């Protein structure tokens, strides 16, 4: 049996990664994801591998297998990312998102915008089981409405993400919900019911904060909203017919059509509507002087795969309707691949297990057991950079420990979701954090302080354990 690295040695790649990422963000700022962060991850991956091979005789094939397995595990997510890039571009240029923004500004009062946004995203995410799909569709529209009403990007993104991850956490259609229940051998609906003990209070507190913030917002500047609405009408053909696209998308989701198929069909339908309702915009994007098949085809393809920058007389709207297409997802995909390399190297070397074993030593009472699980889940989210891997590892590490201490598996499954599912989006180099920052065009560290549900959930898990409320024990 190979000797595992000590916790102190295992921390070397983590410390180096933190230092490199700090230097990268300090040097490159918002451009850190354009290469600096990826190089930092690959550098620490190499350090981890070298330590394991030189001092612990861990063969290269072990690292290669762990890394390739990690990358294979996110292959579907990468495909979804590419389609989301195409969808976000074509939903904008076809007029779907502008139409949602136009009508949304007339329906949602600014004073209750943040709370309404959180509730809307929560309901859609519960029905879809996907925070990614929710944020990539209605989230983008709500982002536009919020900007038009004068809210800061961080507040809007925080409300969107809080609601979306509430739904992702408790929906029976969610992959994370199913994964957490299955990895801990907990019946799905037992898992969901037990999560309500920590999830509902977290959401209520979140809605109170957003309501207070909304009521404190200066909603008197209706002129700005009117200017954005006028600019939308001038640039796009706004019509209720465009609402067919999100309605069809909702029907596909309700019928449990696979995410990739749903997103692809939604992109295809929006493309057809772009040809029907926005031919002038497609010609403008193409740069072809003469209108015809070439200009329409060129504009449509450029919208799907590349960046578009349409000019309007309203600065806020010009920034809002800029799209990046599939190409805009490349830095995110690049970072995910590098993060999977790091997570695989840490797992194969035994360093990940060595570090997480530290938490087990302090597990005496219920609050320390739950606290150790929360800390391990957060640590795994930081180091593996993937919520699915973190859920699997957390469940596997603590399953036997919870059983020996007499706790029901639903306590572990709930704590795992409280610690992992909702916090993954708060980490800049985690696949969730990278994705949502890219989709919403808001840096992770900008929206982090406003994702109240995501911040409160792990704290609520520890609080409930500390007071001993409804702790599930084996009879």
Model-derived features: where do they sit?
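Membrane-embedded alpha-helical segments and adjacent helix-loop junctions characteristic
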Residues: 56-147, 306-399
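Hydrophobic transmembrane alpha-helices of multi-pass small-molecule transporters
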Residues: 1-81, 197-207, 214-338, 475
């Amino acid at each position: 049996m190979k000797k595992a690295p000590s916790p102190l040695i295992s921390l070397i790649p983590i410390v180096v990664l933190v230092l490199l990422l700090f230097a990268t963000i300090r040097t490159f700022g918002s451009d850190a994801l354009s290469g600096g962060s990826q190089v930092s991850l690959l550098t620490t991956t190499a350090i981890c591998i070298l330590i394991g091979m030189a001092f612990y005789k861990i063969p290269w094939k072990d690292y290669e297998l762990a890394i390739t397995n990690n990358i294979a595990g996110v292959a579907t997510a990468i495909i979804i990312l590419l389609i989301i890039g195409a969808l976000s571009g074509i939903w904008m240029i076809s007029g779907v998102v502008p139409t949602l923004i136009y009508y949304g500004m007339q329906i949602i009062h600014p004073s209750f915008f943040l709370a309404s946004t959180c509730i809307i995203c929560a309901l859609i995410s519960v029905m879809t089981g996907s925070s990614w799909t929710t944020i990539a569709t209605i989230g983008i529209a709500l982002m536009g409405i919020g900007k038009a009403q004068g809210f800061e990007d961080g507040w809007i993104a925080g409300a969107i993400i809080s609601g979306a991850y509430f739904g992702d956490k408790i929906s029976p259609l969610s992959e994370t919900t199913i994964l957490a229940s299955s990895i801990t051998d907990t019946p799905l609906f037992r898992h969901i019911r037990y999560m309500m003990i920590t999830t509902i209070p977290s959401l209520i507190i979140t809605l109170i904060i957003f309501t207070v913030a909304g009521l404190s917002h200066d909603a008197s500047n209706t002129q700005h909203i009117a200017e954005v609405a006028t600019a939308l009408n001038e640039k796009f053909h706004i019509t209720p017919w465009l609402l067919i696209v999100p309605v069809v998308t909702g029907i596909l989701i309700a019928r449990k059509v696979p995410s990739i198929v749903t997103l692809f069909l939604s992109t295809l339908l929006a493309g057809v509507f772009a040809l029907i309702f926005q031919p002038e915009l497609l010609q403008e994007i193409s740069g072809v002087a003469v209108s015809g098949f070439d200009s329409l085809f060129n504009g449509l393809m450029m919208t799907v795969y590349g960046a578009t920058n349409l000019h309007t007389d309203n600065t806020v709207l010009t920034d809002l309707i800029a799209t990046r297409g599939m190409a805009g997802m490349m830095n995110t995909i690049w970072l995910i691949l590098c993060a999977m390399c790091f997570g695989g190297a840490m797992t194969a070397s035994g360093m990940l297990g060595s570090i997480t074993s530290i938490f087990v030593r302090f597990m005496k009472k219920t609050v320390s057991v739950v606290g150790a699980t929360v800390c391990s889940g957060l640590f795994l989210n930081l180091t593996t950079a993937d919520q699915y891997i973190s859920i699997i590892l957390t469940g596997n590490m603590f399953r036997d420990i919870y059983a020996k201490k007499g706790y029901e598996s639903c306590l572990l499954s709930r704590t795992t979701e409280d610690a992992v599912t909702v916090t993954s989006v708060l980490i800049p180099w985690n696949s969730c954090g990278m994705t949502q920052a890219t989709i919403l065009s808001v840096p992770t560290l900008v929206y982090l302080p406003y994702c109240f549900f995501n911040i409160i959930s792990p704290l609520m898990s520890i609080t409930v354990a500390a007071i001993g409320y409804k702790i599930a024990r084996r009879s």
